[in-house]
């Protein structure tokens, strides 16, 4: 069994040595740039860990794992363009370093490359892999569309939000694990349980992201705290604050959400205080713990010896141990 750290090293080395020998270079340069920015490489790591539950040669599916990482970074490239973001992982975003049209075209090419790389598997698995990958890619687009529509809605329900983050975030983690299982000839039942494990850990991971944006340490979290509050992003926190607030709290919350001219720190402090009064802090922690607990049940159901699952368990715990 490989450790997650060994797998991460394999993934990074493989990505670094992928060749782009097509022309024009100006189309492929932004792709190399995006994939060289680093990142946690969670999705390829999960795929290889799932494969390694059954087979001892995870290096055999590095191309498929890196296909998923290529796809994930394609979505980030286009997300940055839609959000008009300046920076990603401490680097200029593609549309800022080059231009909007280059970001669109290089992003589109990344999507095609992701499919080309994913297709490099044996024929018996090809249809199952591409069917799952295609449905997942469609679901992620659906999740992104819901997320954009929520920006202009003030009646978003908790269950709608959970479904949105399932589509936008969870299904790609789930897909990574299931593809790893399929390529390793796991049983259909094991592959499905690994998918559900990924789905639940993805929900916990995204809800924790919401939580850390309010209660995290910016030095550890890696970005400025309170960004979701200042942009009025419909998160688990804000949705439940509106749902559970009394009249006075709701009125103050509405005033801050409606404000066009405000002091950033004052707004973050005021909304955080309201969250504390309403009990959103504990509510969010309980929900994160619930989904993390559910994920463990699905991993428990995977029919391989416990010692083989240990590395995947440790990796899931590490995903959830970002500092508050």
Predicted regions, residues:
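All-alpha prenyltransferase/terpene-synthase fold signal
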Residues: 1-324
């Amino acid at each position: 069994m490989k450790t997650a750290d060994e797998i991460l090293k394999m993934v990074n080395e493989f990505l670094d040595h992928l060749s782009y020998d097509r022309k024009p270079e100006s189309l492929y340069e932004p792709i190399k740039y995006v994939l060289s920015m680093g990142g946690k490489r969670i999705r390829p790591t999960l795929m290889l860990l799932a494969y390694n539950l059954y087979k001892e040669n995870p290096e055999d599916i590095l191309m498929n794992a890196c296909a998923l990482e290529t796809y994930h970074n394609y979505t980030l490239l286009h997300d940055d363009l839609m959000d008009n973001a300046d920076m990603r992982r401490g680097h200029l975003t593609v549309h800022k370093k080059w231009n909007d049209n280059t970001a669109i075209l290089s992003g589109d090419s990344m999507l095609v490359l992701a499919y080309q790389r994913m297709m490099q598997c044996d024929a018996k698995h090809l249809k199952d892999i591409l069917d799952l990958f295609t449905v997942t890619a469609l679901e992620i687009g659906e999740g992104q569309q819901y997320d954009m529509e929520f920006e202009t809605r003030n009646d978003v329900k908790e269950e709608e939000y959970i479904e949105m983050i399932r589509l936008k975030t969870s299904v790609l983690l789930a897909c990574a694990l299931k593809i790893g299982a399929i390529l390793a000839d796991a049983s259909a039942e094991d592959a499905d349980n690994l998918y559900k494990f990924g789905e639940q850990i993805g929900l916990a991971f995204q809800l924790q992201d919401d939580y850390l944006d309010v209660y995290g340490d910016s030095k550890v979290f890696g970005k400025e705290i309170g960004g979701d509050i200042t942009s009025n992003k419909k998160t688990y926190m804000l949705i439940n604050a509106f749902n559970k607030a009394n009249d006075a709290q709701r009125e103050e919350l509405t005033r801050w959400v409606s404000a066009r001219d405000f002091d950033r720190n004052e707004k973050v402090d005021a909304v955080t205080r309201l969250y504390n009064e309403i009990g959103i802090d504990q509510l969010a922690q309980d929900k994160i713990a619930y989904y993390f607990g559910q994920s463990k049940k699905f991993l428990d159901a995977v029919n391989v010896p416990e010692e083989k699952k240990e590395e995947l368990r440790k990796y899931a715990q590490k995903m959830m141990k970002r500092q508050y």
